[in-house]
């Protein structure tokens, strides 16, 4: 079945970015001159999605206003609401009625990818295998505890190839890590995920973790992934956002050369 819908969870309050997020949701903070949310909407369209569903909070009306303006003849953008901040799994479940009985992409807006290639790979992998497909990358051992961690089938972990996922663990302690491969914020999910989300229990902080539902799929041999080296900007922290602004601006023909010259001048004095 073709993948035509993308879900973007955007209900978080962005407390790391205070006081800026008192006025502007973190998803609308600019990466130079383009809101982070727009990068993800554009990526969804480039990956073949014709519909984007943003899961947001009623406390962030500017997200709904932006969604109305972001619709084009190629992609329709709408919103649904997450009434309580109960985690990523809960946010995804809030999109169930909008998604219907179809596969869909989940795209985390605080992870900006260099292009749409990984999402396209995951869509193609899902359409070929029929299994939920997730983006993966290798990290240093000290970083594993910041991510969902996966164990993949032996001998099937080469970069940019599809891998069978055997186990999923949410942010393990370093001693409990099952590999150096972690989940990044791109998922193509079967509608089966909604039933799994209904079965999982809240974590210690009261949230419903998407990784717990993915772990159930993995236990049923129904989860695969792509280990990628795609350029990725983590804009979930102020420093990550600053780095993304600088690196993306440097790549632009209209401002990159001037910015590069200014940086050289600034740091060679």
Task: Please provide the spans of the model-predicted regions.
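Cofactor-binding loop segments of dinucleotide-utilizing enzymes, especially the Rossmann-like FAD-
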Residues: 11, 56-57, 109, 137-138, ...
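Short, conserved catalytic or adaptor-binding loops enriched in Gly and charged residues
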Residues: 69-74, 156-159, 216-218
């Amino acid at each position: 079945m073709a993948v035509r819908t993308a879900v973007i969870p955007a209900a978080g309050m962005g407390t790391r970015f205070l006081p800026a997020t008192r006025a502007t949701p973190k998803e609308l903070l600019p990466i130079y001159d383009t809101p982070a949310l727009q990068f993800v909407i554009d990526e969804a369209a480039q990956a073949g999605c014709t519909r984007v569903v943003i899961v947001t909070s009623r406390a962030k009306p500017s997200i709904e206003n932006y969604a109305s303006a972001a619709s084009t003849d190629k992609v329709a953008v709408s919103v649904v609401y997450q009434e309580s901040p109960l985690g990523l799994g809960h946010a995804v479940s809030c999109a169930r009625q909008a998604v219907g009985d179809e596969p869909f992409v989940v795209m985390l807006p605080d992870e900006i990818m260099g292009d749409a290639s990984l999402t396209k790979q995951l869509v193609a992998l899902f359409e070929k295998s029929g299994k939920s497909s997730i983006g993966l990358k290798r990290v240093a051992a000290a970083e594993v505890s910041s991510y969902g961690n996966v164990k993949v089938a032996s001998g099937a972990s080469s970069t940019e190839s599809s891998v069978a996922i055997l186990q999923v663990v949410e942010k393990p302690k370093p001693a409990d890590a099952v590999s150096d491969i972690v989940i990044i914020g791109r998922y193509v999910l079967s509608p089966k995920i909604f039933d799994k989300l209904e079965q999982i229990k809240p974590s210690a902080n009261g949230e419903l973790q998407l990784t717990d539902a993915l772990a159930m799929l993995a236990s049923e041999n129904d989860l695969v992934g792509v280990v990628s080296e795609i350029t990725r900007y983590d804009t979930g922290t102020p420093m990550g956002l600053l780095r993304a602004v600088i690196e993306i601006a440097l790549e632009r023909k209209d401002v990159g050369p001037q910015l590069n010259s200014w940086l050289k001048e600034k740091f060679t004095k």
